[in-house]
């Protein structure tokens, strides 16, 4: 667990400094050449800095151990900050959407510079490296903040490729409206990406139940025990990445209290070995 928090912290810091570098160079060249797609890319980098900063802060809070007032730890902090990230992304995308539409209406052109192409290539390489690194960490630790950042880096590679296409089409083929269209596409992409993160974070914060397959597997495991007649009133409460399970097992009414509680204790230990389960609470109902 400690390694996961350290890895997420490192990924957050790399994202902050990498995106800050890209924001500065893209913002300068974008305003200098009046390229809406490059300005859009710079705004996207600004949102990426916020996302990486939220990753860093959220990871720090969620790594705090359990205490008297937070009995199950601080795992949901990651989802709270992921929610902030998504709202920021969607807000910036709406601003960018309006600017791009106005640019298409006004038929604004941009001033070509070879630096536009150079910065696009630098961005693609930088973001590709950040994506590969962060995606590997996400696969290893299954962290929503790492997942959000990895998807963000991947999207940036594709979006900057679109920016590069708009620059080439505008300068070499005289199709300047592509610049505004690409800005429009980038804004929509950012919004959709933010919406996906928002929904995932919202579901956890609203105590969405465990996935149906895992639930079915656990109930099947419980019912396989010869002394369990049925498994009812199954509840799964998320506490960050893991879940607290509460359910009732029906046992033979002739079974002693001692034996029924030993059975419940055995099942609790067995189920707690599952990677998604933090704690299991079983109520015994003699029938």
Question: Where are the model-predicted features located?
Answer:
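Alpha-helical transmembrane segments and adjacent TM-loop junctions that form the membrane-embedded core
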Residues: 2-18, 22-25, 32-33, 37-43, ...
């Amino acid at each position: 667990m400690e390694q996961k928090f350290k890895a997420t912290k490192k990924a957050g810091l790399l994202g902050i400094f990498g995106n800050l570098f890209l924001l500065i160079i893209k913002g300068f060249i974008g305003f200098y050449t009046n390229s809406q797609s490059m300005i859009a890319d710079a705004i996207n980098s600004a949102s990426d800095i916020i996302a990486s900063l939220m990753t860093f802060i959220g990871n720090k809070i969620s790594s705090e151990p359990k205490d008297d007032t937070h009995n199950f730890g601080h795992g949901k902090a990651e989802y709270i900050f992921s929610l902030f990230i998504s709202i920021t992304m969607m807000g910036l995308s709406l601003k960018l959407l309006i600017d791009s539409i106005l640019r298409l209406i006004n038929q604004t052109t941009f001033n070509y510079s070879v630096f536009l192409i150079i910065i696009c290539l630098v961005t693609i390489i930088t973001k590709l490296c950040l994506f590969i690194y962060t995606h590997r960490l996400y696969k290893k630790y299954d962290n929503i903040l790492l997942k959000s950042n990895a998807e963000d880096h991947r999207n940036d590679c594709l979006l900057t490729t679109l920016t590069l296409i708009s620059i080439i089409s505008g300068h070499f083929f005289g199709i300047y409206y592509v610049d505004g269209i690409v800005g429009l596409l980038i804004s929509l992409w950012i919004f959709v990406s933010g919406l996906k993160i928002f929904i995932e974070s919202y579901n956890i914060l609203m105590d969405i139940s465990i996935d149906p397959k895992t639930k079915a597997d656990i109930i099947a495991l419980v019912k396989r025990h010869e002394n369990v007649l049925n498994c009812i009133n199954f509840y799964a409460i998320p506490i960050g990445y893991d879940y607290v399970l509460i359910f009732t097992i029906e046992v033979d009414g002739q079974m002693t209290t001692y034996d029924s509680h030993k059975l419940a204790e055995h099942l609790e230990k067995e189920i707690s070995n599952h990677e998604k389960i933090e704690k299991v609470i079983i109520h015994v109902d003699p029938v």
